[in-house]
């Protein structure tokens, strides 16, 4: 399928018009009015039965004297992506004011005529329409006899002249597309080739019942108009239309806090993506390689092609991945002599900072258990994304039959990748890929991220932005490019690196969802997205509670435990392929009606624990853990059954058989060394090799240097003040980690789990460290007494006075962190209701003190790709990027705390065009400003943005 290339001037025009165009009016009154009109139309139509032409007469009767909507822009009460059953509904809603013609334009004598047409409808009648989704060539009206063009069209009069006026006056036009949707899933646009659905996706053709309808695509700008011969011979009018950024479904930016039809990057369409077929087999031999020998031959051929294309010194490395990726990724520098950082190590999968996995394993285990129940893997016997999709789609259909499906919500797709392996739509609730045990064709296609990098990417030196990434081939919209991976550190550790490390990526995709629920309220969210689709997310209080329970269980570990047979070397991450340990069920499985289903034991935490080795202290391996709670069935809550198995709740939490005191001591020591190195890197600016035995003394020296430099100017003083604050954070983190390691060594293994994980806990870090030292000195070697789990939420403490001890369960300012909750099994709706502050069933408490100290939902883990990462680490920011971010549950990472960050093409990308995505600096600024309400303003890190986009915001945080 051909790609429309826009000029810089055309992109500039699009941006200028988008900035001056009013947003859709979606207030309750407007939406209620549209719903009332549509209900009236449907009732009248049902009463008329199958009378011919009913949908042509009824709209006028319903609208009465008001008549159709005769204005430009978005019709009030209609959202992007809203679907309609027929042209009558479209007219009643004010989207397209005629049921007969494809172009709705004012009369020639009207004052509106000079501005242009109101709307156009893509029905597929004209064979000369060329539909590329975000842009298309629209054929004018006239000269048709049946389905054949028999006469020349005229540009000088009628509706065609009106569309030409749209081009001249830069007036956006509403676009409505017809589609054909099979009972099995795929969706095809009437004007294009159609979508790749579940069966025979091209053109929307295939088996099963077909349902025709129309969808409001939003506002498009007419960029060009011309006359050219039609396929039948006579001249036709052609109009180049392109989606208006932010005002059309194919180019609307989706923020994490929007549940509606415009989501976290570009919304992709099945109809547009279906035409992007897979490349020819001869072009990329790796596609045909089925065995290791064939893959190696293909790899050697690709390496020879790279050497042939870059024969000179500009080829610095033939493959930066060192053979880890299926395709070699060369490093090219044709600009200067700069080379890659010498301390950079390539990894295809996540790597864990020393001691971090062991620290967060209890929270990961709980998140895995909740996700296990939400995805109903226990019912299917394994991980099958297709089965999950079909289950959610079935629940959507049930809501639709009951008339409770949110207006404007697009039903969940049973397959999220089309036949070419391209993502058909971004999903704010995450994409579920299949596991290794799945063998059906549809399941294998549902493993795009799991397969790793498949495109011929290059790391290259740009003119002004350092290293960047490009592809030697055209990238079709929706194609998987790569993940963003690196070393996993805690949020508290990442906070220390703020301003020093520009390769940090918060795993907060789903934390935004629940923060939005808390802000909007349950009812508002339920009107935008079915609650059964929202995955479970652990709040800050629940994460802290899981750590407290683990600490309590660790203190009950026996002093001496029998030695277990251990692997000789402990790994720090799961296998590169992301495959979970343990056998996979062979053959196809009828899991929920899916074409095959996979199975492998345990969740992400379990798999990661096994892959990380079973050494004492390596973390939970899930052995002996009870199965998930009984699954619910039927109703809207059928898929929303996240909950704990009880093993993590209260005093029932057990660690025996999984970790040992010796193992925890080793993990605590490793983490303390990692935090020490991290603090040194802050004190030394960026280096991780700061001299000096005492990190606290080194930081004090750095603070003295910063204070001395602060006398030069007001600006320098402000900058140094922030540096002083960062040094304080670094000192607090290092002190808390060392105090925890000392406490574990002295005989209190529970102290390991009570270290700061989320950055807000750092405020208490120094106090905990000081209390630890005082308690240790007072007890003369006796470990400090810590509160038991029974004290949680009751204000009770033991041991070190009212302060709660060195590693107590008390948060900043002595408040209980999140009023830690009893972790009873909850449905997705109950969890969401809890997020909104509503009542929840069972003993689950309200948000409590969490809200008093910032957001209730925050990331626990952060990706740091500064020295350890993959090709995604080199992809630059752009205010108008051509890639989009999508959270993907795949491999062993299948919880909302730990998942894959996938980067997908959000439009067709020409070969050798630099790949980029929006880092979200503007969102960070907004969040920081919100966090500063009522407090002192914090120094923001400002860098110049060199992305070159038309709508560049200029400065980055």
From Swiss-Prot:
Residues 560-578 have a biased composition (Low complexity). It is found in: Nucleus; Chromosome. SUPFAM superfamilies: PUA domain-like (SSF88697), SET domain (SSF82199). Residues 73-243 form the YDG domain. Its main location: nucleus. PROSITE patterns: SET (PS50280), YDG (PS51015). Keywords: Chromatin regulator, Chromosome, Methyltransferase, Nucleus, S-adenosyl-L-methionine, Transferase. Disruption phenotype: Loss of function mutant (T-DNA insertion) releases the transcriptional silencing of tandem transgenes. InterPro entries: H3K9_HMTase_SUVAR3-9, Pre-SET_dom, PUA-like_sf, SET_dom, SET_dom_sf, SRA-YDG_sf, SRA_YDG. Residues 455-920 form the SET domain. It catalyses: L-lysyl(9)-[histone H3] + S-adenosyl-L-methionine = N(6)-methyl-L-lysyl(9)-[histone H3] + S-adenosyl-L-homocysteine + H(+). SMART domains: PreSET (SM00468), SET (SM00317), SRA (SM00466). Signal peptide: none annotated. Residues 319-441 form the Pre-SET domain. It is an enzyme of class 2 (transferase). Histone methyltransferase. Monomethylates specifically 'Lys-9' of histone H3. H3 'Lys-9Me1' (H3K9me1) functions as an epigenetic mark of repressed chromatin. Belongs to the class V-like SAM-binding methyltransferase superfamily. Histone-lysine methyltransferase family. Suvar3-9 subfamily. This is Histone-lysine N-methyltransferase, H3 lysine-9 specific SUVH3. It comes from Chlamydomonas reinhardtii (Chlamydomonas smithii). The gene is SUVH3.
């Amino acid at each position: 399928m051909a790609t429309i290339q826009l000029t810089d001037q055309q992109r500039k025009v699009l941006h200028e018009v988008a900035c001056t165009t009013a947003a859709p009016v979606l207030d309750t009154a407007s939406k209620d009015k549209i719903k009332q009109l549509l209900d009236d139309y449907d009732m009248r139509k049902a009463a008329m039965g199958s009378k011919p032409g009913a949908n042509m007469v009824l709209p006028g009767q319903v609208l009465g004297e008001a008549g159709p909507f005769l204005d430009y822009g978005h019709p009030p009460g209609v959202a992007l992506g809203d679907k309609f059953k027929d042209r009558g509904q479209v007219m009643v809603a004010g989207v397209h004011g005629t049921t007969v013609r494809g172009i709705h334009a004012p009369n020639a004598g009207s004052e509106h005529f000079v501005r242009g047409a109101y709307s156009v409808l893509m029905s597929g009648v004209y064979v000369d329409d060329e539909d590329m989704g975000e842009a298309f060539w629209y054929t004018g009206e006239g000269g048709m006899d049946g389905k054949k063009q028999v006469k020349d069209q005229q540009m000088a009069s009628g509706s065609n002249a009106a569309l030409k006026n749209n081009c001249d006056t830069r007036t956006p036009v509403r676009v409505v597309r017809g589609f054909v949707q099979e009972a099995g899933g795929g969706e095809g646009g009437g004007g294009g080739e159609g979508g790749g659905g579940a069966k025979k996706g091209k053109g929307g053709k295939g088996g099963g019942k077909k349902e025709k309808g129309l969808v409001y695509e939003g506002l498009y700008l007419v960029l060009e108009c011309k006359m050219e011969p039609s396929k039948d011979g006579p001249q036709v009018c052609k109009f180049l239309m392109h989606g208006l950024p932010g005002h059309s479904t194919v180019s609307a930016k989706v923020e994490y806090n929007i549940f509606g039809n415009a989501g976290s990057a570009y919304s992709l369409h099945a109809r547009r993506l279906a035409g992007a077929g897979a490349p020819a087999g001869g072009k990329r031999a790796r596609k045909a390689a089925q065995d290791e020998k064939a893959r190696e031959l293909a790899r050697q051929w690709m390496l020879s092609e790279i050497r042939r294309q870059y024969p000179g010194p500009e080829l610095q490395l033939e493959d930066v991945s060192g053979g880890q990726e299926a395709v070699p990724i060369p490093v090219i520098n044709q600009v200067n002599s700069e080379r890659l950082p010498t301390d950079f190590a390539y990894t295809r999968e996540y790597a864990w900072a020393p001691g971090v996995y062991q620290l967060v394993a209890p929270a990961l285990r709980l998140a895995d258990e909740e996700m296990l129940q939400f995805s109903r893997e226990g019912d299917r016997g394994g991980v099958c994304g297709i089965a999950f999709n079909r289950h959610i789609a079935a629940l959507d259909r049930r809501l639709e039959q009951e008339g409770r499906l949110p207006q404007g919500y697009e039903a969940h797709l049973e397959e999220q990748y089309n036949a070419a392996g391209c993502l058909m739509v971004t999903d704010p609730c995450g994409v579920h890929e299949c596991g290794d045990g799945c063998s059906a064709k549809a399941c294998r296609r549902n493993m795009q991220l799991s397969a790793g990098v498949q495109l011929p990417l290059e790391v290259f030196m740009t003119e002004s932005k350092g290293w960047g990434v490009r592809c030697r081939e055209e990238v079709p919209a929706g194609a998987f490019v790569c993940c963003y991976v690196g070393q996993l550190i805690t949020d508290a550790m990442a906070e220390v690196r703020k301003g020093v490390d520009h390769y940090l990526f918060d795993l907060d995709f789903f934390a935004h969802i629940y923060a939005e629920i808390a802000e909007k309220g349950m009812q508002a969210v339920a009107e935008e997205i079915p609650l059964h689709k929202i995955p479970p997310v652990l709040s800050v209080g629940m994460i802290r509670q899981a750590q407290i329970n683990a600490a309590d269980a660790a203190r009950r570990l026996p002093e001496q435990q029998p030695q277990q047979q251990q692997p000789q070397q402990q790994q720090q991450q799961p296998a590169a392929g992301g495959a979970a340990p343990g056998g996979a069920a062979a053959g196809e499985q009828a899991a929920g009606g899916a074409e095959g289903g996979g199975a492998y034991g345990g969740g992400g935490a379990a798999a990661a624990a096994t892959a990380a080795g079973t050494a004492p202290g390596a973390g939970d391996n899930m052995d002996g853990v009870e199965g998930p709670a009984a699954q619910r069935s039927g109703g809207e809550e059928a898929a929303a059954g996240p909950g704990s198995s009880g093993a993590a709740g209260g005093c029932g939490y057990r660690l025996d058989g999984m970790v040992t005191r010796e193992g925890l001591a080793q993990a605590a020591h490793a983490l303390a060394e990692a935090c020490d190195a991290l603090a040194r890197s802050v004190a030394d600016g960026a280096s991780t090799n700061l001299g000096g035995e005492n990190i606290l003394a080194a930081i004090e020296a750095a603070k003295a240097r910063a204070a001395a430099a602060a006398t030069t100017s007001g600006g320098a003083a402000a900058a140094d003040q922030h540096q002083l604050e960062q040094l304080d954070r670094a000192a607090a983190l290092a002190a808390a980690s060392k105090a925890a390691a000392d406490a574990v060594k002295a005989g209190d293994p529970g102290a390991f789990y009570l270290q700061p994980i989320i950055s807000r806990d750092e405020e208490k870090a120094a106090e905990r460290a000081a209390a630890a030292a005082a308690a240790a000195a007072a007890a003369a070697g006796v470990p400090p007494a810590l509160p038991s789990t029974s004290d949680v939420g009751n204000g009770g403490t033991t041991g070190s006075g009212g302060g709660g001890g060195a590693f107590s369960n008390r948060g900043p300012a002595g408040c209980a962190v999140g009023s830690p909750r009893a972790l009873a099994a909850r449905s997705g709706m109950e969890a969401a209701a809890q997020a909104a502050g509503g009542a929840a069933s069972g003993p689950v408490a309200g948000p409590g003190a969490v809200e008093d100290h910032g957001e209730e939902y925050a990331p626990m883990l952060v990706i740091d790709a500064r020295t350890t990462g993959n090709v995604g680490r080199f992809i630059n920011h752009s205010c108008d990027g051509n890639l989009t971010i999508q959270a993907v549950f795949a491999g062993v990472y299948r919880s909302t705390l730990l998942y894959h960050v996938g980067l997908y093409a959000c439009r067709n990308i020409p070969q050798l065009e630099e790949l980029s995505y929006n880092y979200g600096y503007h969102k960070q600024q907004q969040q920081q400003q919100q966090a500063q309400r009522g407090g002192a303003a914090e120094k923001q890190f400002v860098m110049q943005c060199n992305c070159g986009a038309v709508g560049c915001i200029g400065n980055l945080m």
